[in-house]
Amino acid sequence: MNTVRVTFLLVFVLVVSLGQADKDENRMEMQEKTEQGKSYLDFAENLLLQKLEELEAKLLEEDSEESRNSRQKRRIGEGVPCDENDPRCCPRLVCLKPTLHGIWYKSYYCYKK
């Protein structure tokens, strides 16, 4: 009976000591995986930040191009009604009172000089 108790006690001590070693190893593995995950997340975050900065630069470039060309788009073409006090006709056009077809509308139109 004593040998059985001693055997069980020995097996119990071995299981407990090996089990604790496994817990420590598991804990260390989990810490390594967490650190790797953090480094991966940092890398992904930096990559996403670079892509967003590139996209923002492209959008700002397009906006600046639009503002550069916006003056030409706001000008009025030939045969379009204009305001006599604030003519916005193209540079080669003049805001004049129409001679025939626009008399009925009582409006000014952009004509060639």
UniProtKB/Swiss-Prot annotation:
Q: What is known of its domains?
A: The presence of a 'disulfide through disulfide knot' structurally defines this protein as a knottin.
- What family is this protein classified in? Belongs to the neurotoxin 14 (magi-1) family. 01 (HNTX-16) subfamily.
Report where it is expressed, by tissue: Expressed by the venom gland.
Pfam families in the record = Toxin_22 (PF08092)
Which residues are trimmed away as propeptide when the chain matures?
A: 22-74
Its organism's taxonomic lineage begins at:
Eukaryota, Metazoa, Ecdysozoa, Arthropoda, Chelicerata
Q: Which positions carry the signal peptide feature in this UniProt record?
A: 1-21
> One GO MF term, please?
sodium channel inhibitor activity
Q: Which UniProt keywords apply?
A: Disulfide bond, Ion channel impairing toxin, Knottin, Secreted, Signal, Toxin
What protein name is recorded for this chain? U11-theraphotoxin-Hhn1h
UniProt cross-references to InterPro entries, sorted A to Z: Toxin_22
